C-alpha cells in the first residue's frame, strides 16, 4: 500500500514517550525514499506516454501517485522535524554533553545538527550578561531558594563553588550548595536534590 512505510515512521515517533528519542530509523526512511523514487519514475513515464499517445486515461493515475508522493514527503518531513525538536529539547535537559545512550540513537547528521545548535546557543549565551555571559539553560523554572541540599549519587571529585571553596563530591555525601551550580549535575545524574 502506498505511504504505509512513511506512516509507520510517524507512528513510531508518536508511540515513543515524550522526552525520549527512539533510534533513527534509517532503513524505514530509505524505503520511503525508494518508494518516492519509483512513484516519480512511474509518473514520468505515464506523463510522457499521455503526451505522446494522447492517453488521457492515465491522468487520474498520475494524480493519485502525485498525492502519494506529497503524503510521503509530508510524513518524512514530520518525522525528521519532530526528531530535531526532541534533540533540541535534550540540549536543554542534559546540557552540552549527551549521554552515550542518547547519542547512539542519533544519526550522524543529527549529531552534527546538535553540535551546531549547542555552539549557536553557547555563542548567544556568551553575548549576554557582560564578560562571563549568562547561562540561560539554568533556572528554567524560578527557584524557591538559592541554596539546596543535594546528595551525591556517584564519585565526581572536586567541585568548585563561586566563592572559591572546593567541595569533594563523593558517593552518598550530602552538601548545601548554590542551586544554579548544582542543576547541571542533577540533570546528569551525579547529584540528587534532597527534599526535606
Curated annotation (Swiss-Prot):
CDD domains: GINS_A_psf1 (cd11710), GINS_B_Psf1 (cd21696). It comes from the Eukaryota. The keyword Nucleus applies. Coiled coil: none annotated. Gene3D superfamilies: 1.20.58.1030. One of its GO terms (biological process) is inner cell mass cell proliferation. The keyword Nucleus applies. Keywords: Chromosome, DNA replication, Nucleus. It is found in: Nucleus; Chromosome. GO terms for cellular component: CMG complex; cytoplasm; GINS complex; nucleus. Required for correct functioning of the GINS complex, a complex that plays an essential role in the initiation of DNA replication, and progression of DNA replication forks. GINS complex is a core component of CDC45-MCM-GINS (CMG) helicase, the molecular machine that unwinds template DNA during replication, and around which the replisome is built. Component of the GINS complex which is a heterotetramer of GINS1, GINS2, GINS3 and GINS4. Forms a stable subcomplex with GINS4. GINS complex interacts with DNA primase in vitro. Component of the CMG helicase complex, a hexameric ring of related MCM2-7 subunits stabilized by CDC45 and the tetrameric GINS complex. Belongs to the GINS1/PSF1 family. This is DNA replication complex GINS protein PSF1.
Amino acid at each position: 500500500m502506498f505511504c504505509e512505510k512513511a506512516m509507520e515512521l510517524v507512528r513510531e515517533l508518536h508511540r515513543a514517550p515524550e522526552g525520549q528519542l527512539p533510534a533513527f530509523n534509517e532503513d524505514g526512511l530509505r524505503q520511503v525514499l525508494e518508494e518516492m523514487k519509483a512513484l516519480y519514475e512511474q509518473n514520468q513515464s505515464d506523463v510522457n506516454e499521455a503526451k505522446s499517445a494522447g492517453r488521457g486515461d492515465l491522468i487520474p493515475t498520475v494524480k493519485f501517485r502525485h498525492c502519494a508522493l506529497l503524503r510521503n514527503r509530508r510524513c518524512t518531513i514530520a518525522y525528521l522535524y519532530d526528531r530535531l525538536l526532541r534533540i533540541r529539547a535534550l540540549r536543554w535537559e542534559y546540557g552540552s554533553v549527551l549521554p552515550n545512550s542518547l547519542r547512539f540513537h542519533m544519526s550522524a547528521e543529527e549529531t552534527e545538527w546538535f553540535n551546531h545548535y549547542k555552539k549557536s546557543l553557547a555563542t548567544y549565551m556568551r553575548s549576554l550578561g557582560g564578560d562571563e555571559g549568562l547561562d540561560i539553560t539554568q533556572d528554567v523554572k524560578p527557584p524557591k531558594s538559592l541554596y539546596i541540599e543535594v546528595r551525591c549519587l556517584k564519585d565526581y571529585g572536586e567541585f568548585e563553588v563561586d566563592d572559591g571553596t572546593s567541595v569533594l563530591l563523593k558517593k552518598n555525601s550530602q552538601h548545601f550548595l548554590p542551586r544554579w551550580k548544582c542543576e547541571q549535575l542533577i540533570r546528569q545524574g551525579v547529584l540528587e536534590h534532597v527534599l526535606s
